[in-house]
Amino acid sequence: MAAPTSLIINSAFTEPQQHWAENADRTLRLEPARRPAGYEIIDTRENTRRQVPIPLVDTIRERVRQWRADGWPGTTAVTLALLQHWRDADKVSRRQYPFYFCQLEAIETLIWHLEALPEYRQGIHIQGDGGEFERLCNKMATGSGKTTVMAMIITWQVLNALTYPKSPRKYSSAVFLVAPGLTVKARLQVLLPGHPENYYDLFELCPSEALRSKLNRAQVLIENWHALMPLKEPERSVVRKGQESDEAFARRVLGSLAVCKNLVVINDEAHHAYRKPADVKLSKAEAEAMGIDLDEATRWVEGLDRIHKMRSIARCYDLSATPFAPTGRSNTEAGLFEWVVSDFGLNDAIEAGLVKTPRVVV
């Protein structure tokens, strides 16, 4: 076929129905189905690239699709009210900022994992990262609205925690948000319910004034990942206090949240936070060439481990456009986080018109 004049072929507000596929000669053809979940590995040394499928995500997509069609069986009354409010066709048409399909699918997948009836989750095992607390990851392209998904996670968790305080599902009204830098931390302040430009009001996340009022009781702490670094003793200190204890660390990092237990953690740009496998032998120079800060990655997770030890992390939600970590198989290869449960990548975002598209030369 002739080269396309536009790469945008899907609506941002409905599930993708088609995608561009690449022929052997690098030309494009239109496939009449949603793009299977996957990612691309590029070897710059060999000038090659290959597609790696994520079959687990494809299976989860189908389960979530069926669960949605059946009316989300198993959800609490609060969760059902939220899902109906977010999906309501009449409300969507009059919303100033309607939700993208990828945002709804991301939050639905997290809810499905915790609340769907067992038959909708039967046979599905999500591999963790080897740590003691559960992690789930939404793979979402930059520009697809990750911050809104974080606001939806907080709304869902907090309202359920306050409504069902004895629920065995361990919802939490205490949320610890970890940002990859000070600029992002400043941008995430809109996730504080009392912020004048908060996302809960901007995106009309609560179906009633009563629930919106209840949401104000959320305890949300937003910190830069550097807060998770061990405390260094001043070099000129006369009195040697010794290494900071785990309890002192938890109190210092969590501040007002230090009185809480069973926290929910949200990692923004979570590709900065992973456990370095023992078989990964990377020098600092090699890591830098891959765009990896090994110290940041390990310190980030080590800090969360210490918090889990003292306060317990009910679950951890990771959001990232590039949730990859070194595999140890080669210096140029990175592997996908094994706890990715949804995928809306850069190509999907381009085809839905959510990010700027490269100019197509005809």
Q: Residue spans of the language-model regions?
A:
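RecA-like P-loop NTPase motor core of helicase/translocase proteins
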Residues: 1-362
